[in-house]
Amino acid sequence: MTKILLSKGKLLDKETESIQNSIDNVNNQRQWIHSQNIDDLLEFFDKLGRYWAEKYSKEIGVNSKHLISFLSKENLGKKLDIALRGNRNVIEKFIDLSDPELIFHAQPRGVVVHWIAGNVDILGIFSVVQALITKNVSIIKAPAKYQLL
């Protein structure tokens, strides 16, 4: 028996004999996130950071300002540009990066699994966001009393 608590952004809290539906869902989500424009993803996280700052800064606590800064479009865009040879669009399409013999296109790994520590709530968000902006789907094992996701 496998217990599924959350799937496709909805609380389920059910047990299942087979996780095939979850596997199919992950594969569908991989296709969906790969089809998203990188600038749209960055804009989403920028808006999410501002929303959390406005609505949940007390719950997030002392790390609220750091989280908002991390989620900013400017910060995440810089991280991508550094990781992707100076051009984040390489995750969208083939790009000529001035190598006469090559053109580049970054591919997501696919599925990233996160085990989130219960003693540092905010750390899990950083790794999940980095997986998502590189167009990877996340499977998250959160501690029992995890409130941020």
Segments (PLM) and residue ranges:
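Conserved small-residue-rich beta-alpha loop and adjacent elements
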Residues: 92-149
